[in-house]
């Protein structure tokens, strides 16, 4: 009976979740340990984002490299080719910015949190943090006298409630005995004495209970003051963490927000300028002069037979090879590129590894001035297929799209003899075909 009564009387206190209850300060102490863990979580968060930025930067670089190669090998030409290529330049520059973002996240933001955490939390030899132990000891010291009084109060309350219970039980028995014929006067007197004794016990326990309760009330202000003092110290420590992490988050935002970067804005300003610089009419004129009616032509004319030059016809018929990359001089004396735009396959087909040959043919049905019969059965492309290895004597930067660029000491393959303008057709080790000045190289 007494056990069930105790449980019922203590139930309201057990459900109380107030900070002032004994032991409930532990949530405030735990917040210190949580702060250290949250610093670790933020560093992990930043580290993962930096990893994403690094991967994205590498993907942009790989994409730009691949498509720049595809564009160079593809059929696009002129100013639009340069505008298209500017997209790859944008990717390279944005890749650099994301690489810088990754570096800022790791070298600045993450290191800043790491250093602050090291200065704010001090590990103990026995485990845990010094700051946590100081808070725990402070709360325990402030709460100890009050907790002792509360223990006395619980005991006094328990005794008072038990006395009340016994009194009620004695009164009930005494009243019931008056209606029972079997109860003797002596027994009736004992029951009455029991009631009187229980009432005295109730009076004594009530007085003690009220006295202890009064003592608790007197110690409560001092208890609250001590607990408030320790709590405010914990609040100040937590405030430093909250303010610091807010500053770090603002730094992270600044590093992530490329829209506020002047370099980022400049990238797209330059990209727009490059795209707007594309001129369809210029490209059409260039194509007309290099692959259309604007090209120079050695029109057929009567030639006297010269017995001293038995291979004249064959040499004349080798000239059409220049359509793949030779340079011819027009009537005004200006060197014009005759590189055929159709010689390059489409951008996407290059990626599939397809090879595209020149579209024109020297078959007799399409070339009334050529043929193996007229050349004594020789193949005008044998010389191109074989080639001769040569070494550059000087640096040369191609001035036209059909010209090769190389450095002194580079080796390349010579694919034809020098023409009357002093140009040779060759192939770089990268596979690029084009023209170069014949006197800039020597045979290896």
From Swiss-Prot:
One of its GO terms (biological process) is positive regulation of dendrite development. GO terms for cellular component: axon terminus; cytoplasm; cytoplasmic vesicle membrane; cytosol; endosome; ruffle membrane. It is a peripheral membrane protein. Its main location: cytoplasm. InterPro entries: AH/BAR_dom_sf, F_BAR, FCH_dom, PACSIN1/PACSIN2_SH3, PACSIN1_F-BAR, SH3-like_dom_sf, SH3_domain. Residues 13-283 form the F-BAR domain. Residues 313-384 are annotated as: Disordered. Residues 26-275 form a coiled coil. The modification Phosphotyrosine is found at residue 394. Residues 336-358 have a biased composition (Polar residues). Phosphorylated by casein kinase 2 (CK2) and protein kinase C (PKC). Keywords: Cell membrane, Cell projection, Coiled coil, Cytoplasm, Cytoplasmic vesicle, Endocytosis, Lipid-binding, Membrane, Phosphoprotein, SH3 domain, Synapse, Synaptosome. Residues 385-444 form the SH3 domain. GO terms for molecular function: phospholipid binding. It is found in: Cytoplasm; Cell projection; Synapse, Synaptosome; Cell projection, Ruffle membrane. It comes from the Eukaryota. The modification Phosphothreonine is found at residue 184. Residues 314-324 have a biased composition (Basic and acidic residues). Binds to membranes via its F-BAR domain and mediates membrane tubulation. Plays a role in the reorganization of the microtubule cytoskeleton via its interaction with MAPT; this decreases microtubule stability and inhibits MAPT-induced microtubule polymerization. Plays a role in cellular transport processes by recruiting DNM1, DNM2 and DNM3 to membranes. Plays a role in the reorganization of the actin cytoskeleton and in neuron morphogenesis via its interaction with COBL and WASL, and by recruiting COBL to the cell cortex. Belongs to the PACSIN family. The F-BAR domain forms a coiled coil and mediates membrane-binding and membrane tubulation. In the autoinhibited conformation, interaction with the SH3 domain inhibits membrane tubulation mediated by the F-BAR domain. DNM1 binding abolishes autoinhibition. Homodimer. May form heterooligomers with other PACSINs. Interacts with MAPT. Interacts (via SH3 domain) with SYNJ1 and WASL. Interacts (via SH3 domain) with DNM1; the interaction is reduced by DNM1 phosphorylation. Interacts with DNM2 and DNM3. Interacts with both COBL and DBNL. Identified in a complex composed of COBL, PACSIN1 and WASL. Interacts with EHD1 and EHD3. Interacts with TRPV4. This is Protein kinase C and casein kinase substrate in neurons protein 1. It comes from Bos taurus. The gene is PACSIN1.
